[in-house]
């Protein structure tokens, strides 16, 4: 009996068929032997198999199973398999390119799925907090430069969440489609103290050209965000400053937009965290490793959407079970 391909193998093969961001000019020095997509394939394996260190990935790939044999073949270029040092170096550099890849993939999904065919072309922009692994670095210790416990991730930081209070960790900044399907279009991961409006331009520049309305909360009511939206031909709709209840002429329209935004982004955030165990501490330490985990999870979410669209499956209901079962 010929064994069937696992769903993980199917998803990894799909990476060869999706578009990638424009390649920059060649750098001086030794030419690149392995394409970026080879390491995207490895990233998908890491996210699905809950592997967060390079040696864990290589140990699992070395297992003598049919699935691992197939995956090793997909991670080979011109009959060459990367060395351990190459894996470490290229996977360390992968987070820098993930926002552009996610943006490119998001635009491709919008083109295929056409989520705005029957509704307004709006995007919700927001950030969600992820708790750091290990202990927390209290302000008094940080100011003294003292790290009281080795479990503390010193690259994380504090933020105050309206829902969770003070949290030590990271912020996952996301823009997603406001429609019947929640498609992540762009993403960035920073330490938790990064201001939402400072990261917003990077998210907005990656949006599909069809996106007309950008819906945000009060944190995005900032001159730099308005400027970027104006440059890119979009309309920014945010909560306004001042005491409640607001009585200006646009308040009723803003309430409608705010409701649409809340339904889209809050559902996506909860869906995403439920799939990738984001309600507890992240499984990684350090900015680069956490970027690779969180942005890699967004990429896997996009890949799962593409598979389910191609096979005429529901794009919201059943997605969590589908990814968990891979």
What would you call each of these model-derived segments?
Residues 2-49, 90:
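Basic, short loop/linker segments at the boundary and entry of helix-turn-helix/winged-helix-like folds
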Residues 29-30, 242-250, 313, 317-325:
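Arg/Lys-rich, glycine/proline-spaced intrinsically disordered segments
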Residues 70-95:
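Major-groove recognition helix of helix-turn-helix-like DNA-binding domains
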Residues 27-37, 164-165, 283-294:
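Structural motif
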Residues 92, 96-218, 223-228:
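Polybasic low-complexity intrinsically disordered regions
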Residues 54-75:
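DNA-recognition alpha helix
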Residues 218-284:
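Helix-centered, glycine/charged polyanion-binding patches within enzymatic domains
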Residues 255-326:
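Basic, amphipathic alpha-helical segments enriched in Lys/Arg and hydrophobic/aromatic residues
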């Amino acid at each position: 009996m010929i064994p069937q391909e696992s769903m993980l193998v199917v998803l990894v093969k799909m990476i060869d068929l999706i578009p990638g961001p424009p390649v920059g000019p060649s750098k001086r020095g030794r030419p690149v032997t392995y394409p970026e997509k080879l390491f995207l394939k490895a990233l998908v394996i890491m996210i699905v198999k809950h592997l967060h260190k390079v040696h864990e990935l290589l140990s699992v790939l070395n297992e003598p199973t049919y699935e691992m044999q197939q995956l090793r073949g997909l991670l080979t270029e011109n009959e060459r398999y990367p060395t351990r040092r190459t894996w470490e170096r290229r996977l360390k550099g992968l987070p820098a390119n993930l926002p552009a890849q996610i943006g490119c993939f998001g635009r491709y999904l919008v083109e295929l799925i056409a989520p705005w065919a029957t509704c307004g072309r709006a995007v919700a922009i927001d950030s969600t907090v992820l708790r750091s692994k290990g202990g927390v670095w209290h302000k008094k210790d940080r100011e003294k430069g003292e790290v009281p416990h080795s479990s503390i991730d010193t690259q994380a930081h504090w933020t105050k969440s309206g829902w969770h209070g003070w949290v030590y960790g990271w912020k996952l900044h996301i823009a997603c489609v406001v429609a019947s399907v929640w498609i992540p279009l762009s993403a960035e991961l920073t330490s938790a103290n990064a201001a939402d409006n400072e990261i917003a331009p990077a998210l907005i520049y990656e949006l599909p050209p069809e996106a007309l309305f950008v819906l945000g909360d009060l944190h995005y009511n900032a001159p730099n965000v308005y400027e970027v939206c104006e440059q890119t031909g979009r309309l920014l709709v945010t909560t306004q400053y001042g005491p409640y209840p607001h009585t200006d002429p646009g308040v009723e329209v803003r309430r409608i937009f705010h409701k649409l935004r809340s339904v889209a982004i809050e559902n996506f955030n909860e869906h995403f965290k439920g799939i990738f165990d984001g309600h507890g501490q992240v499984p990684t330490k350090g900015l680069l490793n956490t970027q690779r985990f969180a942005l890699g999870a967004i990429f896997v979410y996009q890949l799962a959407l593409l598979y389910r669209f191609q096979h005429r499956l529901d794009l919201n209901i059943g997605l969590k079970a589908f990814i968990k079962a891979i």
